[in-house]
Amino acid sequence: MEQEKRIFSIDWAGRPLVVEIGQLAKQANGAVLVRYGDTVVLNTATASKEAKNVDFFPLTVNYEERLYAVGKIPGGFIKREGRPSEKAILASRLIDRPIRPLFAEGFRNEVQIVSMVMSVDQDCSPEMAALFGASLALTISDIPFEGPIAGVTVGRVDGEFVINPTVEQSEKSDIHLVVAGTKDAINMVEAGADEVPEEVILEAIMFGHEEVKRLIAFQEEIAAQVGKEKMEVVLYELDPQLEAEIRQLAEEDIKRAVQVPEKLARDAAIEEVKASVIAKYEEQEADEETLKQVNEILHKLVKEEVRRLITEEKIRPDGRKIDEIRPLSSEVGVLPRTHGSGLFTRGQTQVLSVCTLGALGDVQILDGLGIEETKRFMHHYNFPPFSVGETGPMRGPGRREIGHGALGERALEPVVPSEKEFPYTIRLVSEVLESNGSTSQASICASTLAMMDAGVPIKAPVAGIAMGLVKNDDNYTILTDIQGIEDHLGDMDFKVAGTAKGVTALQMDIKIKGLSREILEEALQQAKKGRMEILEHMMQTIREPRKELSKYAPKILTMQINPEKIREVIGPSGKQINKIIDETGVKIDIEQDGTIFISSVNEAMNQKAKQIIEDIVREVEVGQIYLGKVKRIEKFGAFVELFNGKDGLVHISELAEERVGRVEDVVSIGDEILVKVMEIDKQGRVNLSRKAVLRDKKEKKGKRPERHRMKP
């Protein structure tokens, strides 16, 4: 039977939010078309009928960009969308993170959410429409989702918070924050800010959560009318009898193993206990399912003991205090031929960041749905398998690496000098050499050091720290500088980066259903204390950016010309500019306002290129005398080059004061002669005279200075 199309609407930050259900994608478990202004996103939620034989919840979120949404045809030879853009990957992660905690423990059915962006109004965020639509598609479906959730963007313009700021408002905003959650609590935060105090960030989060509650009420109203009955699923459970056996067998050994301070030794101790228990069951010829359960029960025991130690005894696996940072070390100038490098080590987490400076022509070209076309500041994060002592394939960046790179970029961007102040493209690459948690924050610290070593005049150094949480009912403990095991077995990964003045980036992921204001406030203040300690350490390594760039970095010379002269500098089909580049070996970037950036490692070549361009755009002035070179001789006169690209004609009658029979009697090709500009005609032709120069000289010579007699 044909399902009836239903339409629901609400005002969202001054723009209409319209939801259509029942017409499109009806074979999915849940499907919602969201119209937010002129932004249109089709959201579907689909689940497998049977549970998968895996030890995790198999959720996949795909945020699919279609370039037709902004009236573009994809570039390149193939002319169709390929792998997801960086922005699409970040949007997929943004949707995944608040939704994932809201499925029951033990739910192992595969779930896929697809958000297909079909039309984009730049003032109505497709990411926010997709987040809303993904939650609603799950809520009205028969998939056992414990939502709904919603998310909003919060900006701050002239001291006032704004929900879902427009493009114009975003340009003026000093906060760019996304907050998501349920009606009772916050479960995801993603933010960039211009050194904003923690108190303001907290208020922005709570302001956004009020709007989240309103959107959730709207979803509940829709679900009450069109929602399906939830499917019955069998949740994966551990065998209680087997669990009791293993507790008796291994609990004491695990308690000792998790308190080994050093990561590799601790991992080895835990693995030894696990191997011993599994070997006993293998001797009993236990089947594959039993062995799988044995492994999961052992993991559960490790998790319980780590959490118990932290919440009850305030003891961490490596013996640190709750708010203690691991030992820090850092250095700069590690690599001799790079433009700048910084090595930052925190415990067993180590990152080497390298800064490379390029010309403005080296900017990244963006081919996506946003209004930005280029990017001059980039931060790339790499996580090779050897960093955790493992082998593995060396592929291109995955979702996690792209996400960590973007977080670092967002944290550092507020302190990067403007194009006008520092006309360079800046690329940072963070290589994770050792990992035991908080690598994304270590990459921020190492990148700050690398930029300072490169001589980038950053406004202030930035440091990052990751906070953790272990929560059992009402009893909770916030951890400073979490390591891998605390991240893996804890309830929160709360990353905060900033300067001494305030926060520049923030990212919060949790595994529980939500957090209260009190926990958020405490975590932010504890993070600030830790950040200040790390900044103090970094300042001991390098106090300020180097005054001079590396000798291997390009030197950029800036000049300004009349915009109407740009065509002359470029020349037909780029002939003129390519000639300058070939002759000098420089890179030349020209802005529409006539600003020209000339860059090369050789400063002398920069000056040579500048002189050539100045000659091209230089105007010939009537009445001025120039030293020119004879380039061509005709019967009627000589063509003289005044400067590069500018010729004029000295008619035979203007070559000398006396009558000239043949031009060659007075000048030859290659001669340098003084000429005066007599006229520039309507066609732009320049008429020159040598005779006028000779006459002027004669007149000056003929003038005698007046003699004044002394009075008696």
Curated annotation (Swiss-Prot):
Matches recorded under InterPro entries: ExoRNase_PH_dom1 (IPR001247), ExoRNase_PH_dom2 (IPR015847), ExoRNase_PH_dom2_sf (IPR036345), KH_dom (IPR004087), KH_dom_type_1 (IPR004088), KH_dom_type_1_sf (IPR036612), NA-bd_OB-fold (IPR012340), PNPase (IPR012162)
Claim: Magnesium is one of the keywords in the record: yes
Gene3D superfamilies according to UniProt: GHMP Kinase, N-terminal domain, K Homology domain, type 1, Nucleic acid-binding proteins
Positions of the S1 motif domain: 623-691
Pfam families in alphabetical order: KH_1, PNPase, RNase_PH, RNase_PH_C, S1
Span of domain KH: 554-613
Locations listed in the record: Cytoplasm
Record-level Gene Ontology MF annotations: 3'-5'-RNA exonuclease activity; magnesium ion binding; polyribonucleotide nucleotidyltransferase activity; RNA binding
Binding site for Mg(2+): 487, 493
Cellular component, GO, one term: cytosol
Entry annotated with the keyword Membrane: no
Gene Ontology process terms (BP): mRNA catabolic process; RNA processing
Catalysed reactions listed for this entry: RNA(n+1) + phosphate = RNA(n) + a ribonucleoside 5'-diphosphate
Alphabetical keyword list: Cytoplasm, Magnesium, Metal-binding, Nucleotidyltransferase, RNA-binding, Transferase
Cofactor section: Mg(2+)
Main location: cytoplasm
EC number: 2.7.7.8
Known role: Involved in mRNA degradation. Catalyzes the phosphorolysis of single-stranded polyribonucleotides processively in the 3'- to 5'-direction.
HAMAP family per UniProt: PNPase
Alphabetized NCBIfam families for the sequence: polynuc_phos, PRK11824.1
Family as reported in the entry's similarity comment: Belongs to the polyribonucleotide nucleotidyltransferase family.
Protein name: Polyribonucleotide nucleotidyltransferase
